[in-house]
């Protein structure tokens, strides 16, 4: 045989590698799983295994597994089932020659002890009887014989103890041959102790001839007392085990050795014994649960620190104070506040309740993180070290639609934006900056259409100077007046540009008079408003307008910080399919750079790229510079503030907090049910005409303007316009699915449907409308609303006749002889019978005759006979009113 690895040798020996390594460790050879086994090591292992083969064959091992399910009671009252597996392993070893000899010696010693004890008893009885017969009477002999009988029982008990000790060590001697000698010593020591006790008793009995009283040995009393204490300890352990096992005693405890012990006592006649039985557990008692909760009443009032935010519910407040909600409600009722368990209460009320119940209140500002991140900036205007520099003025161009605002801006920028706009009108805010000889100016072009009121209001809020454009041939119009109101509300200086001055019908003086009525007084009239005559077509007066703007900005002394973390404002935002959310912002202070972490309303992100108004890539932008940036998580609302922060993680937390607050505000705006709302809902249930719309637009501002305009088209209950969704971006599959489920019309403003959505639209034949001009969108929706309205009719009175007499006709029944007093009576028209100015019948005119001839109409001042269909209760003096149903158009 050659050297082999430990794995191959284990496979050859048909045992595991671990077992083989264990065998090698028995013979003092250490091996590992990757070791090599030599031929010499194999021979040593085989020899060792052959020597121990006889020992192995003398052992018999029995293994038994018992599986059961234990049901354990839980706190909630339900029982939990636990699977239990009990494994038993019994080993039987054949006795050796030495163990057999030990057993024989032990049996011989027991027999010798029994003979010696018997001889001691016989000898003691003889001596006692002889002594007593000489000194005592018959009654005393009887007592002594009883005591001797008790001593004999005690000796028998000691023999039983010796037998049990022997049996115990016999069982132990069968375990292993190596422990045989140790067991012999233990058995011999125990035997010596018991034998000494027996000899002491016998010697005491032998000395009884000199003493008439017998006393118990101290060792026996001490042993009995120890045994008594041991039994009490076992009883306590058994009780604890019962509770721990769910009220069930194990077999080991049930089969425990409950010995009957004799309690030795001493009296005046000698030693007496009483039978002592250990206390047992009362099995009739009800089994207690293994899991028992015990609540101890606090000895003193517990005061906690309660952290309260801006709002908190009653249940949450009770949870923070670790009390029941009913106690909180009771305390609130005592304070005069009625609330339910789920009602939201404000911070002041919660503080009052918590302090009333003895707790310390810590008020927490929910926007603390928001304030922290806003203040953690490197720009501090109040600091003396901050350097302020002039910035370009932000000028907003406002005015009525088609008054030439964008054309004027094109003339200033030398571009042609107006010609490229759809419909020739501006439908979003555009920001541009222009460099002049005297400095730079940033212009904001706002829409003039009535639907873009919110856009114009935002433009005024972020501007420094407003240029109000008024057409010289058109005059002051509604949007012009609205712009003046926005200017007054924002308290912004204004420069009036009277455009189209080169037209023949231009009348600047009339415009000055009209604006004077609205509070804009020209400088030549003693006011402070500059009026500049310009022409966007020819360019006349453009330089004068720029000089007026720069003069006004110099008077304002516009200064900001040019370096540091930037702050900007959102002008417009839209969703680009390739680039994601695109946000047009206007920098107000600092320098905005690529890579900055920004927070904008409920959105956050990192600036990935920036472009100017010409579409060129830039890396930074200073104050008063409009840019388009990429990198936000979503499209923010127009007018939101953009702030550069240091930590992106904190920016995300603030954005999520703002989203939650926005959701709470939307829920709070829902009106609580009252009588008026209930009647309004009952009224609306009868309305069957409802127009569901899904609005998709290119920019956020356009979406808001369209939504507001469409909601204003509702006709007061006859037709309800319900906007199910309003968002930016193209028409997607989700929008089409929503339209199909809700039977809605999809309105797309400067957007188109993607291929997947287009296929679904064609398959389901959904109604999708595309628009590029907001005029067309509003007009078509208005026509659709009017088409859904139920037709309206009004009663037009065409004639009035007075009944003078009533005749009986076999064909028509009662016929009224009438005189037409007003208008004309026509056949087959609707009529009303009026008696004492009260309508008693409304029906149809069935017969109209002039003398005996049927006629179609009878004019005023002519007598006629009128027959009314299905009505005979007509009296003389009644008035018959003839009317026609005329359809009226909706306004």
UniProtKB/Swiss-Prot annotation:
Q: Where is this region: G5?
A: 535-537
| Region feature (G4) | 499-502
Q: Where is this region: G2?
A: 424-428
**CDD domains (UniProt xref):** IF2_eIF5B, IF2_mtIF2_II, mtIF2_IVc
Give every tr-type G domain span: 390-559
Q: Which Pfam families does the UniProt record give? A: EF-G_D2, GTP_EFTU, IF-2, IF2_assoc, IF2_N
User: Which residue stretches belong to region G3?
Assistant: 445-448
Q: Where is this region: G1?
A: 399-406
Entry GO CC: cytosol
UniProt xrefs under Gene3D superfamilies: P-loop containing nucleotide triphosphate hydrolases (3.40.50.300), Putative DNA-binding domain, N-terminal subdomain of bacterial translation initiation factor IF2 (3.30.56.50), Translation factors (2.40.30.10), Translation initiation factor IF- 2, domain 3 (3.40.50.10050)
- Which one of the record's GO molecular function terms can you name? translation initiation factor activity
Localization (cell): Cytoplasm
What's in the keyword line of the UniProt record? Answer: Cytoplasm, GTP-binding, Initiation factor, Nucleotide-binding, Protein biosynthesis
Q: Where does GTP bind?
A: 399-406, 445-449, 499-502
Function noted in UniProt: One of the essential components for the initiation of protein synthesis. Protects formylmethionyl-tRNA from spontaneous hydrolysis and promotes its binding to the 30S ribosomal subunits. Also involved in the hydrolysis of GTP during the formation of the 70S ribosomal complex.
UniProt similarity note = Belongs to the TRAFAC class translation factor GTPase superfamily. Classic translation factor GTPase family. IF-2 subfamily.
Q: What is this protein called?
A: Translation initiation factor IF-2
The gene it comes from is infB
């Amino acid at each position: 045989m050659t050297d082999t690895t430990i794995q191959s040798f284990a496979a050859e020996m048909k045992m595991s590698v671990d077992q083989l390594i264990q065998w090698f460790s028995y013979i003092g050879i250490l091996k590992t799983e990757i070791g090599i086994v030599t031929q010499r090591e194999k021979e040593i292992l085989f020899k060792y295994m052959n020597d121990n083969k006889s020992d192995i064959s003398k052992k018999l091992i029995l293994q038994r597994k018992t599986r059961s399910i234990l049901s354990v009671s839980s706190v909630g009252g339900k029982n939990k089932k636990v699977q239990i597996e009990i494994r038993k392993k019994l080993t039987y070893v054949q006795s050796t020659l030495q163990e057999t000899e030990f057993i024989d010696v032990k049996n011989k010693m027991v027999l010798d002890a029994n003979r010696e004890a018997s001889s001691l008893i016989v000898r003691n009885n003889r001596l006692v009887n002889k002594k007593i017969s000489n000194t005592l009477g018959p009654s005393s002999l009887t007592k002594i014989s009883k005591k001797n009988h008790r001593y004999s029982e005690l000796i028998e008990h000691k023999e039983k103890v010796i037998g049990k000790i022997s049996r115990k060590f016999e069982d132990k001697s069968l375990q292993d041959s190596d422990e045989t000698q140790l067991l012999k010593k233990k058995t011999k020591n125990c035997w010596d102790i018991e034998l000494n006790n027996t000899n002491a008793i016998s010697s005491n009995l032998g000395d009884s001839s000199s003493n008439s009283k017998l006393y118990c040995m101290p060792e026996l009393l001490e042993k009995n007392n120890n045994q008594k204490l041991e039994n009490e300890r076992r009883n306590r352990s058994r009780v604890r085990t019962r509770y721990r096992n769910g009220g069930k005693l194990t077999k080991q405890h049930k089969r425990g050795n409950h010995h009957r012990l004799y309690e030795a006592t001493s009296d005046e006649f000698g030693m007496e014994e009483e039978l002592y039985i250990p206390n047992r557990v009362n099995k009739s008692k009800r089994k207690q649960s293994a899991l028992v909760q015990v609540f101890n009443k606090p000895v003193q009032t517990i005061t906690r620190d309660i952290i309260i935010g801006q709002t908190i519910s009653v249940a949450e407040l009770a949870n923070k104070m670790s009390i029941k909600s009913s106690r909180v409600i009771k305390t609130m009722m005592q304070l005069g506040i009625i609330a339910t368990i789920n009602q939201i209460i404000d911070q002041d009320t919660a503080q009052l309740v918590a302090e009333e119940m003895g707790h310390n209140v810590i008020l927490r500002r929910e926007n603390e993180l928001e304030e922290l991140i806003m203040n953690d900036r490197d720009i501090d205007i109040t600091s003396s070290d901050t350097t302020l520099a002039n910035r370009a003025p932000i000028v907003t161009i406002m005015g009525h639609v088609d008054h030439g605002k964008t054309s004027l801006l094109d003339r200033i920028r030398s571009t042609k934006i107006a010609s490229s706009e759809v419909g020739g009108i501006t439908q979003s805010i555009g920001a541009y900056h222009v460099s002049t000889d005297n400095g730079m100016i940033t212009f904001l072009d706002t829409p003039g259409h009535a639907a873009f009121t919110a856009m114009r209001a935002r433009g005024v809020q972020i501007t420094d100077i407003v240029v109000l454009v008024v057409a010289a041939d058109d005059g002051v119009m509604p949007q012009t007046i609205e712009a003046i109101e926005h200017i007054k509300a924002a308290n912004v200086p204004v420069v009036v540009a009277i455009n189209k001055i080169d037209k023949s019908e231009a009348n600047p003086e009339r415009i000055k008079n009209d604006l004077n009525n609205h509070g804009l007084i020209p400088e030549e009239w003693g006011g402070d408003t500059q009026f500049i005559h310009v022409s966007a077509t020819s360019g006349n007066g453009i330089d004068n307008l720029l000089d007026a703007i720069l003069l006004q900005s110099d008077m304002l002394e516009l200064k900001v910080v040019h370096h540091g973390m930037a702050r900007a404002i959102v002008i417009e935002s839209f969703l680009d399919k390739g680039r994601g959310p695109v946000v047009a912002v206007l920098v107000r202070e600092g320098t905005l750079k690529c890579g900055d972490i920004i927070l904008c309303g409920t959105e956050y992100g990192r600036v990935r790229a920036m472009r100017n108004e010409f579409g060129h890539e830039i890396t930074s932008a200073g104050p008063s510079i409009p840019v388009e940036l990429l990198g936000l998580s979503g499209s923010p609302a127009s007018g939101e503030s953009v702030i550069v922060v240091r930590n992106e993680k904190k920016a995300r937390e603030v954005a999520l907090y703002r989203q939650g607050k926005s959701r709470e505000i939307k829920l709070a705006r829902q009106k609580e049910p009252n009588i008026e709302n209930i009647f309004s809902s009952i009224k609306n249930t009868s309305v069957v005409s409802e127009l569901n719309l899904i609005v998709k637009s290119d920019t956020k501002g356009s979406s808001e303007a369209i939504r507001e305009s469409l909601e204003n088209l509702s006709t007061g209950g006859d037709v309800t316009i319900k906007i199910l969704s309003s968002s930016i971006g193209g028409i997607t599959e989700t929008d089409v699915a929503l339209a199909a489920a809700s039977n809605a019309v999809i309105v797309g403003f400067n957007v188109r449907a993607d291929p997947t959505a287009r296929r679904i639209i064609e398959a389901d034949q959904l109604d999708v409308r595309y628009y590029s001009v907001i005029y067309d969108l509003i007009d078509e929706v208005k026509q659709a609303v009017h088409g859904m309205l139920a037709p309206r009719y009004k009663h037009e009175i065409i004639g009035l006749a007075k009944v003078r007499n009533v005749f009986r006709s076999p064909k028509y029944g009662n016929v009224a002889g009438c005189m037409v007093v007003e208008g004309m009576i026509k056949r087959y028209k609707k009529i009303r019978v009026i008696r004492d100015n009260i309508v008693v019948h409304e029906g149809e005119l069935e017969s109209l005759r002039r003398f005996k001839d049927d006629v179609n109409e009878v004019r005023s001042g002519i007598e006629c006979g009128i027959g009314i269909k299905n009505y005979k209760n007509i009296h003389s003096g009644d008035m018959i009113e003839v009317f026609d149903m005329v359809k009226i158009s909706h306004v």
